């Protein structure tokens, strides 16, 4: 029995009670959200006792994912393990292993161990393609069984959610490749599947075998994350016919997953102009009847190379404030290189800021308590309190101490002109005058 089926049957389980406790909502609210497919729980039954309770969807606090993993030109397992630990330390809710180089089974298991208790996601088509490339000399020799067996292997390992690019049809792939899009296909998984379909003249195996895949996910009660192969990789491609056509297919797949009793969420772009971010979220929610929306950024400009974590956090904050549920971080290395550990930290913090800013809008009673406390700490110049409440206490302390200790209670920005010190001095003076003895 999946948690979705339990919820549909009106049963409030211990896991639902735990979600309610973590999120600060009523268990019945959680049950109704799960039953409607508007909330998912990111945990594979194989790891149910080892994974933190992370629920995504309507009424849940906005979650942040950190992508890590090797490339086939830079294989440093120790660095990826360090990235997993950094993502966990600085507050990511989940980690995805996107490795494409090295022994992918070993790497996935090491990252899973390092990231625990965070849920782990993967994109199994990467391993299916790379393993066949290693064995046979070219990834396009992979068969449908290679893909399905890789998915099953990841499920058996305890992977909690997987991106499946099932909505990229053969027809859409052929049209996109010949289109005048700025960037026809920017999804790695999508490009692999497009090349495979065009080479073999067959339909997308993730789509043609979708019912079988649903049965596999149902057994482990893991979550399918429906990938968007034709997401816009440039602002000018946002919401074009290819992007929206794939979204329509994904909406139908959401319905099929729900009918099969499988938890499912939808992935979104990408690169979207600022004035279209809200419309993007509302459209996705409308077409999927409120499926949890997992969005990459979105980046609101294409020219922020080196600062794409900022461009993405701007879009992410707007998207989440208007209903996106799950933000996939972007690092400063986006579009330029494999991120290093420090860039992973910067990406996590940027998107935690975005998620928290959105939650203040969506759930002020739950989210704003810490901001209220921070304001009080600042008002009394309680530096230890300010640092403790910061999203990145290490960074806050580093900057606070960057010129060494100050001789006064304020900081070096204002010195003796600190607004709080000035007002405090004035108040004390007035108080002394008020209580001075009469002449």
UniProtKB/Swiss-Prot annotation:
Lyase as UniProt keyword: yes
Annotated Zn(2+) binding sites: 271, 335
Positions with a binding annotation for [4Fe-4S] cluster: 411, 414, 418
Cofactor note: Binds 1 [4Fe-4S] cluster per subunit. The cluster is coordinated with 3 cysteines and an exchangeable S-adenosyl-L-methionine.
Ligand binding (substrate): 67, 96, 126, 165, 187-189, 228-231, 267, 294
Reactions mediated catalytically: 5-amino-1-(5-phospho-beta-D-ribosyl)imidazole + S-adenosyl-L-methionine = 4-amino-2-methyl-5-(phosphooxymethyl)pyrimidine + CO + 5'-deoxyadenosine + formate + L-methionine + 3 H(+)
GO molecular function: 4 iron, 4 sulfur cluster binding; carbon-carbon lyase activity; zinc ion binding
Superkingdom per UniProt: Archaea
Listed HAMAP family: ThiC
Function: Catalyzes the synthesis of the hydroxymethylpyrimidine phosphate (HMP-P) moiety of thiamine from aminoimidazole ribotide (AIR) in a radical S-adenosyl-L-methionine (SAM)-dependent reaction.
PANTHER family: PHOSPHOMETHYLPYRIMIDINE SYNTHASE, CHLOROPLASTIC, THIAMINE BIOSYNTHESIS PROTEIN THIC
Record-stated family: Belongs to the ThiC family.
Name of the protein in its database record: Phosphomethylpyrimidine synthase
Organism from which the protein derives: Ignicoccus hospitalis (strain KIN4/I / DSM 18386 / JCM 14125)
Phylogenetic classification of the source organism: Archaea, Thermoproteota, Thermoprotei, Desulfurococcales, Desulfurococcaceae
Primary gene name: thiC
């Amino acid at each position: 029995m999946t948690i979705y089926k339990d919820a549909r049957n009106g049963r409030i389980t211990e896991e639902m009670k735990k979600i309610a406790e973590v999120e600060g909502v009523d268990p019945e609210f959680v049950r109704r959200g799960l039953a409607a497919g508007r909330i998912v729980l990111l945990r594979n039954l194989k790891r149910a006792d080892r994974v933190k309770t992370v629920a995504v969807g309507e009424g849940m606090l906005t979650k942040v994912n950190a992508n890590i993993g090797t490339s086939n030109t830079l294989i440093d397992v120790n660095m990826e393990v360090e990235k997993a630990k950094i993502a966990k330390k600085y507050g990511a809710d989940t980690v995805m292993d996107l490795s494409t180089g090295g022994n992918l089974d070993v790497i996935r298991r090491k990252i899973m161990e390092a990231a625990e208790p965070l849920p782990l996601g993967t994109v199994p088509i990467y391993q299916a393609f790379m393993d066949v490339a290693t064995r046979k000399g070219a990834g396009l020799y992979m068969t449908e069984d290679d893909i399905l067996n890789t998915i099953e292997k990841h499920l058996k390992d305890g992977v909690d959610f997987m991106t499946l690019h099932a909505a990229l049809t053969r027809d859409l792939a052929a049209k996109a490749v010949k289109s005048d899009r700025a960037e026809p296909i920017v999804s790695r998984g999508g490009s692999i599947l497009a090349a495979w379909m065009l080479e073999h003249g067959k339909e997308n195996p993730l789509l043609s075998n979708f019912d079988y895949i649903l049965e596999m996910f149902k057994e482990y009660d893991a979550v399918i994350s429906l990938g968007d192969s034709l997401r816009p990789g440039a602002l000018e491609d946002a919401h074009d016919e290819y992007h929206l056509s794939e979204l329509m297919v994904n909406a139908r797949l959401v319905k099929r997953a729900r009918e099969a009793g499988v938890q499912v969420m939808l992935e979104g772009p990408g690169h979207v102009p600022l004035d279209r971010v809200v419309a993007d979220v509302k459209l996705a929610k409308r077409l999927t009847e409120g499926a949890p929306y997992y969005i990459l950024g979105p980046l609101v400009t294409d020219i922020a190379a080196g600062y794409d974590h900022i461009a993405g956090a701007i879009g992410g904050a707007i998207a989440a404030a208007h209903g996106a549920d799950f933000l996939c971080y972007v690092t400063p290395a986006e579009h330029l290189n494999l991120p290093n550990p420090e860039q992973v930290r910067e990406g996590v913090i940027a998107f935690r800021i975005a998620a928290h800013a959105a939650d203040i809008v969506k759930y002020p009673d739950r989210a704003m308590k810490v901001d209220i406390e921070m304001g009080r700490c600042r008002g009394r110049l309680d530096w230890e309190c300010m640092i403790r409440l910061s999203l990145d206490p290490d960074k806050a302390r580093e900057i606070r101490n960057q010129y060494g200790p100050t001789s006064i209670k304020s900081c070096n920005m204002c010195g003796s002109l600190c607004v709080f010190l000035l007002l405090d001095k004035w108040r004390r003076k007035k108080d002394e005058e008020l209580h001075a003895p009469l002449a």
